[in-house]
Amino acid sequence: MLKTTLLFFATALCEIIGCYLPWLWLKRGATPLLLIPTGLALALFVWLLTLHPAASGRVYAAYGGVYVCTALLWLRVVDGVKLSHYDWAGAIIALCGMLIIVAGWGRA
């Protein structure tokens, strides 16, 4: 379970980086050269999705919970925004949903 969760976090981080870099370019006028690491991050994201040991729809559903938590960590660390009680509650609920889905992978 820990290995799968870490794989989900790595996958989410690649997806967020792959979306954040073009956002910097379009929204903040950063260099278009950011599109090069964007492509690499998104290619790595797709490859990491193939490493998950379940049907793709189930992987995407479980991954969503970890993505929520990773995005909130990004909000705090990169954007410098303090998380609210609602952020924490939502992250816990999303993570619990992911854990329930992953726990059932071998039983479905």
Swiss-Prot record:
Cellular localisation: Cell inner membrane
One Pfam assignment: UPF0060
Keywords, alphabetical: Cell inner membrane, Cell membrane, Membrane, Transmembrane, Transmembrane helix
Membrane protein topology class: Multi-pass membrane protein
Domain of life: Bacteria
GO cellular component terms given for this protein: plasma membrane
Transmembrane segments: 6-26, 29-49, 61-81, 86-106
Keyword Transmembrane: yes
Family label: Belongs to the UPF0060 family.
PANTHER family reported in the protein's UniProt record: UPF0060 MEMBRANE PROTEIN YNFA
Xref: NCBIfam families: PRK02237.1
Protein name (database record): UPF0060 membrane protein KPK_2870
